[in-house]
Amino acid sequence: MASKTKASEALKVVARCRPLSRKEEAAGHEQILTMDVKLGQVTLRNPRAAPGELPKTFTFDAVYDASSKQADLYDETVRPLIDSVLQGFNGTVFAYGQTGTGKTYTMQGTWVEPELRGVIPNAFEHIFTHISRSQNQQYLVRASYLEIYQEEIRDLLSKEPGKRLELKENPETGVYIKDLSSFVTKNVKEIEHVMNLGNQARAVGSTHMNEVSSRSHAIFVITVECSERGSDGQDHIRVGKLNLVDLAGSERQNKAGPNAAGGPATQPTAGGGSGSGSASGSASSGERPKEASKINLSLSALGNVIAALAGNRSTHIPYRDSKLTRLLQDSLGGNAKTIMVATLGPASHSYDESLSTLRFANRAKNIKNKPRVNEDPKDTLLREFQEEIARLKAQLEKKGMLGKRPRRKSSRRKKAVSAPAGYPEGSVIEAWVAEEEDDNNNNHHPPQPILEAALEKNMENYLQDQKERLEEEKAAIQDDRSLVSEEKQKLLEEKEKMLEDLRREQQATELLAAKYKAMESKLLIGGRNIMDHTNEQQKMLELKRQEIAEQKRREREMQQEMLLRDEETMELRGTYSSLQQEVEVKTKKLKKLYAKLQAVKAEIQDQHEEYIRVRQDLEEAQNEQTRELKLKYLIIENFIPPEEKNKIMNRLFLDCEEEQWRFQPLVPAGVNNSQMKKRPTSAVGYKRPISQYARVAMAMGSHPRYRAENIMFLELDVSPPAIFEMEFSHDQEQDPRVLHMERLMRLDSFLERPSTTKVRKSRSWCQSPQRMPPPSTAHASMTSVPLHPATVVDHD
């Protein structure tokens, strides 16, 4: 077993180059990358270089050319990391590179072909094979799958994959995702099913450079908990966490813009390949520039973190600049062992992107992590499972569903065992039991399923016997004529109650046993049902494979060291046989130093050009965001009233954990919303809301029209009104002024009638009789209103 802690460990970086595609070969692009597998060097040639410019060389822990196999990468680079995770370390594997360089192929590969399987399916097989070969250890394996799409965290295993999750931080456990679903898996088939479900919901799309391009960063998390009894007799739990990261590729819109076809995005099929479908959040080609902007921003934040960690001069590490860097905080400079796979494109048109990837990977080599074993953490799910299983087992033993295991001889035989408590006296159970010679040796256990099946069968027989016995007692009670009918009925009811209690207890016991079996099946215990000979052979093959990989690594390191020493030896050699030899040696050394000087100058120039490109990309993203902000300000100023805007601004607050502005709830948390709302002030004491003017008018005792009436209680006056017929047929021949004066005179005569004239008036029950205005007032008010020649109705 490896040591529990190390002072520091460098981040392991490997480079992998894909072959030229048919499209690139048809376009006439040449190969500009050269991979030296033995020395671990990558040589990049500039297709636009001036005559005499030397190619750039980068050295990594390992390199894999276009002819490399998936198994070579996994066995030599990833397998030691998975072994460390099984021992309780945190581990991370992530692929970085330009879009279309084979990141998803490296991480996932082709699931249906064993030779083309990537890192993730090989890791599944490795983990469960190790568990099956282990001895005296209990394992619990759970898996989670998430993606970061446009800086939003989504759970790919949730029923609502588009729902946004929150990123939280705990001082003890570090960064975690709230409400992230996790599934306990028992074998390779189950964890592959979980992976395929997540792939169906992942956002992918088609671009010019890749038909199935990942539009989000995906992280598959495997947590392995192991319980093992220590020398002190106590169970110790180790927790290893493996992050398998498939990053979206960095891209430029002039090269990797959306396909001409546009249309919906595609999704991986259940087999891990690619198919067609509707990807979440990627419904049209118009989303591609926005997706690319978010991808490049998060990768730029990742580059800033790596640059700050590699420089050893920065006191602040900008982990909070992106969701991706916060989730990978432990993997970059923290408690984890990390492997970075830099994927490269060999074509000449990808020179700038390949150079950027190589520089990024070269900086990452200088990051130092501090991995340690996560032993006996507080929040382990395995410990909760063990405690719950022990509690259920105790209840089942108390109810008599589980038999105790006798320990005498080391032979297994079929024998009769006494029935547990609750069975009739003298009943026995035939079951397979294991007898051991040594009471302290518990390696050989009885076949538990056979024993439990026998116990359940006898429990059913016992229940049937009890039913028959109760039926016989009921029949005996009914035939007994010495008992009074009331006593018979009472005894029969007691027997029925006993039978019903027995049935309920049986159902509860069966539910308890089912829960116990379900929880126990989730715990994986190695060393069962495996042939020892085959097991030993597989272990020996793995050890040999690891020794070969370790030997290759040492050979590569020794060759790199020999090259450095040759240069030092050449510089230290100072004795020459003649002046001519000294001139030749120093001329050669001068040319070599001059070439190095030119390479450094070219590197500085490339760095300056790269800086200009990055700045232009950032300025373009900033201008795009500024345009969106101006558009939103324009909408707010023209369509939202100032008072509504102030209400919104007053509700805003900054969420420090998410670093985003949020709205405060309209109703404060903790307030009981079930209480009835108060009646508005304008309607207190009235049947309906009344304006302030109407209330003042009512208080002053003026016109009763301001009174609050209920029309349902209004008494109607059904008496017909007085009707007077007036002749206006000759008015058309007269002068209009004369006609108007005649009308006024008729109105005066009508108003000045004596009170004895019978005229019926109708008024509301709430109206009081009002004094009619004098004739002069009536004249003044009616002079400007011409009367239509029609029937006049007097309503007062």
From Swiss-Prot:
Localization per record: Cytoplasm, Cytoskeleton
CDD domains from the UniProt entry: KISc_KIF3
Region (Globular), start-end ranges: 633-793
Keywords for this protein: ATP-binding, Coiled coil, Cytoplasm, Cytoskeleton, Microtubule, Motor protein, Nucleotide-binding
Recorded GO CC terms: cytosol; microtubule; microtubule cytoskeleton; neuronal cell body; neuronal ribonucleoprotein granule
Stored PROSITE patterns: KINESIN_MOTOR_1, KINESIN_MOTOR_2
Regions of compositional bias (Low complexity) in chain numbering: 256-269
Matches recorded under Gene3D superfamilies: Kinesin motor domain
Chain positions covered by the region annotation Disordered: 252-292, 397-422, 758-796
Coiled coil location: 378-632
GO molecular function: ATP binding; microtubule binding; microtubule motor activity
Domain Kinesin motor: 10-367
Residues binding ATP: G97, Q98, T99, G100, T101, G102, K103, T104
Keyword Cytoplasm: yes
GO terms under biological process: microtubule-based movement
Composition bias, Basic residues: 401-416
Database matches in SUPFAM superfamilies: P-loop containing nucleoside triphosphate hydrolases
Stated family: Belongs to the TRAFAC class myosin-kinesin ATPase superfamily. Kinesin family. Kinesin II subfamily.
Function: Microtubule-based anterograde translocator for membranous organelles.
The protein's assembly and partners: Heterodimer of KIF3A and KIF3C.
Record's protein name: Kinesin-like protein KIF3C
Organism (species): Mus musculus
Gene for this chain: Kif3c
